[in-house]
Design a protein with these regions (language model features):
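Short helix-initiation/N-cap motifs at beta->coil->alpha
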Residues: 75-88, 104, 182-188, 258-272
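Short, solvent-exposed loop/beta-turn-alpha elements that line the ligand-binding surface or hinge
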Residues: 122-133, 177-182, 223-242, 290-295, ...
């Protein structure tokens, strides 16, 4: 996740970058040889956010099937911190895991600029798995020379998660179908937020952060930061402009809790009931469960997202050239991304499959935690209708700078024009 953005059900350790590097330097890298070591093999996997493998019991299941394999996972909560650490380790050639996670906003950069630092999975037979994945998921991880640098774990079709208890106390409807009609457009969603604010229980906000609005609105368009020719167009993109304006509107209306996503205060806000709605890709369901805990069971629900269908996040598993256990690593990622495991992952955690056979299997899935919401139908419909986004090498960098600028609007009251100027400067500094 994305994501996977940041992309999920995690109590991931803050500051885990340094810990991960230390552990992986000891057990995850070394010679480029890919052969099996004698005796029991420890396969290291380094991720960000929550991929859900551990939470869904998949590691334990794999270890039972392969008693000579032990899986050791390290993770970093914030993807941008993870990515910076990964780039440092790739440049230095040390501290890399046998398997590294890659967010969808980074996969084009890996495929186009860093494919020489990762194994071509075709060499291990990955070409035979192509039929399992959606065309866009497979294509994004394919380099110009045909090398496949990663296997997809999930997609991020979007919906709206909301607290039924808070909406009820504010005198608003709680039925998911009624709400879907009331917020069929983003303007309708903001207008409903204004109504919520008048009778908001406690000090609760309508939404956690306007970053949530921006990311999900932008995720509903094919072109965001790059056009089909690979040209960077973010500052003239209609999709970015629409997402920016709606986010600023929500900030000025005082609808945001001004929470920094993925921060400790954001995590605590789930359990505290500090906000009523959260635009949520499928992988966010597991994150909500992890942070809201038992106290949130049955209070959350899921409805169709305002506007049109969109996608936020989704991830890949890749094998660095410096992996010590390449064959074992490939067998593990092949198994983790297989239709059977992607089906289990969605049913247990909420990560929506990027596997075509798995998508067909989860259509009838409901989630008791989210008021028995038909998540298979809601996210399945979004996945089917969402545009295939054009990905660029610096998608995630651009998005982070825009998010920082919007945070100034909701936290400091910075004007839209000034914040936009700051975003442009930030992007220029980030990518040159």
């Amino acid at each position: 996740m994305h994501i996977a953005r940041a992309a999920r059900t995690t109590l991931a350790r803050l500051g885990a970058v340094a810990l991960a590097s230390a552990l992986l330097a000891a057990c995850g890298t070394g010679s480029a040889g890919g052969g099996r070591s004698s005796g029991k093999v420890t396969v290291s996997i380094d991720l960000f956010g929550t991929f859900g493998f551990k939470e869904a019991g998949l590691y334990g299941e794999y270890e039972k099937l392969h008693p000579d394999i032990t899986i050791r996972q390290t993770d970093t909560e914030q993807e941008q911190n993870y990515w910076k650490s990964l780039q440092t380790r790739l440049a230095g050639g040390g501290g890399l895991a046998d398997i590294q996670g890659v967010e969808i906003g980074r996969i084009t950069s890996v495929a186009q600029l860093q494919s020489d630092k990762f194994e071509d999975l075709n060499e291990y037979g990955a070409a035979g798995l192509k039929k399992n994945f959606t065309a866009s998921k497979w294509g994004a991880a394919t380099a110009k020379n045909g090398a496949v640098v990663g296997l997809g774990t999930d997609n991020g079709p979007e919906a709206m998660c909301y607290r039924t208890d808070l909406l009820r106390k504010a005198g608003l409807p709680t039925d998911r179908d009624v709400l879907a009609k009331r917020w069929s457009t983003w303007q309708g969603y903001i207008d409903l937020g204004r109504q919520y604010k008048k009778n908001a229980p406690g000090k609760s906000a309508w939404i956690d952060s306007v970053r949530s609005i921006y990311t999900n609105v932008a995720g509903q368009s094919k072109e965001r930061y790059y056009n089909a020719s690979g040209k960077l167009i973010w500052d003239t993109s209609p999709a970015v402009k629409q997402a920016w304006d709606l986010s600023v509107d929500a900030a000025h209306a005082g609808l945001s809790g001004s929470l920094d996503q993925w921060s400790p205060s954001w995590n605590q806000a789930f359990a505290a009931g500090s906000f009523a709605t959260l635009p949520c890709p499928a992988w966010m369901l597991g994150y909500i469960k992890g942070q809201a805990g038992k106290s949130g069971d049955g209070k959350w629900d899921v409805a169709t997202l305002p506007g049109q269908a969109g996608n936020w996040g989704g991830s890949y598993l890749a094998i660095p050239r410096m992996s010590r256990h390449k064959k074992e690593a490939y067998e593990l990622i092949k198994w983790l991304t297989a239709p059977e495991q992607q089906t289990k992952l969605f049913r247990k955690v909420g990560n929506f499959p990027s596997s075509v056979p798995a998508i067909e299997k989860v259509a009838d899935t409901k989630d008791p935690y989210f008021s028995n919401a038909p998540i298979g139908r809601i996210f399945g419909s979004a996945a089917e209708q969402a545009p295939v986004q054009i990905l660029g090498v610096n998608d995630q960098d651009v998005q982070e700078q825009i998010a920082k600028a919007l945070f100034e609007v909701e936290r400091k009251g910075t004007s839209s024009d000034t914040a936009w100027s700051n975003a442009r400067k930030g992007v220029q500094n980030a990518i040159g």
